Amino acid sequence: MARIVDLLATGQTFSFEFFPPKDKEEEQLLGRTIADLQPLNPSFVSVTYRGGRISRERTTRVVVDLLKTTDLTPMPHLTCVAHPRFELGEIIGGFRAAGLENLLALGGDPLPEEESYKELAYASELVELGRRLGFDSIGVAAHPAGHPRSPDLKSDREHLAFKMKLADFAITQFFFKVEEYERLRDQMAALGITKPILAGIMPITSLVSVQRMAQLSGYAVPDDIVRRIEAGGDDRAEIRKRGIEVATELCRDLLDAGVPGLHFYTLNFSKATREIYANLGLVGSGD
């Protein structure tokens, strides 16, 4: 299986994020989405992780199934939340034993009190643990607007620089302006970090949903983007069309700016990503 760090060394990557299904209906949806997106030949795919025993089982099942039954390169997410250190070691060891080569190490979002146990405080500690247990291709998260729990942007950038010195690449939270990415990249370069920072892409198919997700990550959708989407009125098809246009333009701008990779947050649906691929003229796109 390919290592993402090696793929990035050879050129731009295009990748997709999925979340593990909670029931049979979601499982069938994910299966259809993977079947729809596999012909686009993504560089890799990632599978999210919430934290705790159930999430551990679900994420592991999906990534191992992808590894065994498809030609895709899967990367599990892993968070510090809800696991003592020895359990995190068991999970990482299980990933390696299954043949996985890539890991996305995250601090993790707060969980309900009964699941909130957290022995490792920072993603950087998880990166170090992953290294010791055999992972040579590890990514971390980056927030263009700053992590919601960071006291200020300066400390956020310093913490990100520390993480990226330990890791191999970063994937950003979603954003909507190429300037936001360029600012982050330049700030990291000023701190001596030139490792790849992949851009997270979230197509707007519902403004309310995206604004809610953005708020959870401490980000606000830019006003001009909001106005552009809202100009679609109550016409859902028009709103969706405008959202795809916004995402396509952002991807073009990022590619022109030399972004090392685009990582699409699919929400387990394929259509928006396939449309953006087609708009960009990327191979394998279409229905």
Enumerate the language-model features and the residues they cover.
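Catalytic domains of carbohydrate-active enzymes, especially glycoside hydrolases
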Residues: 33-48
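N-terminal amphipathic alpha-helix/helix-capping segment at the start of soluble metabolic enzymes
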Residues: 1-16, 23, 28, 284-287
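Conserved, mostly hydrophobic/aromatic
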Residues: 17, 45, 95, 163-166, ...
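Short, acidic/polar
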Residues: 24-37, 59, 85-93, 151-162, ...
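Active-site mouth loops of central-metabolism enzymes
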Residues: 13-29, 74-86, 139-155, 230-245
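Active-site pocket-lining/capping segments in soluble small-molecule metabolic enzymes
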Residues: 3, 118-144, 149, 191-244, ...
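Active-site-adjacent beta->alpha loops and helix N-cap segments on the catalytic face
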Residues: 1-5, 25-28, 53-65, 84-91, ...
